[in-house]
């Protein structure tokens, strides 16, 4: 999250998530080496650590704006949304050689649906 531009104050968590999906996509598309290293890592340990770090930063951002409650459940969900997004983009990179608009729409759908289900519980 520190690599991304500062997001404006969002009306709700969905809006913030969409802003950050677009920000991550733009970062990956303009930094191909970082995209490849992040989406095609050499070990699962590195994948998990990056997802956890990004998810924790995302959770802090969402909570700081009072968009999500401060719970371990929501923290873990933010970590999972980071991993889910990377899984979908990894498929795009492997199949298409880039991050396509169709896969980015799928990332947005998946992260919103997952976090929505966690927050509804």
Give the predicted meaning of each segment:
Residues 14-33, 42-67, 75-79, 105, ...:
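Amphipathic alpha-helical packing segments from all-alpha helical-bundle domains
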Residues 1-16:
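Amphipathic alpha-helical linker/stalk segments
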Residues 4, 41-42:
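C-terminal catalytic region of ATP-dependent kinase domains
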Residues 68-76, 95-99:
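Short acidic, glycine/proline-enriched loop segments that cap or flank alpha-helices
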Residues 27-30, 34, 60-64, 82-100, ...:
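Amphipathic C-terminal alpha-helical segment
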């Amino acid at each position: 999250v520190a690599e991304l531009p500062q997001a404006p104050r969002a009306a709700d968590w969905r809006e913030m998530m969409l802003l950050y999906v677009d920000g991550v996509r733009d970062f990956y598309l303009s930094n191909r080496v970082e995209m490849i290293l992040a989406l095609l890592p050499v070990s699962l340990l590195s994948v998990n650590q990056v997802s956890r770090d990004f998810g924790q930063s995302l959770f802090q951002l969402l909570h700081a704006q009072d968009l999500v409650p401060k719970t371990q459940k929501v923290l873990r969900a933010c970590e999972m949304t980071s991993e889910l997004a990377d899984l979908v983009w990894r498929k795009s990179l492997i199949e298409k050689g880039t991050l396509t608009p169709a896969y980015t729409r799928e990332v947005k759908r998946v992260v919103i649906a997952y976090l929505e289900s966690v927050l509804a519980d």
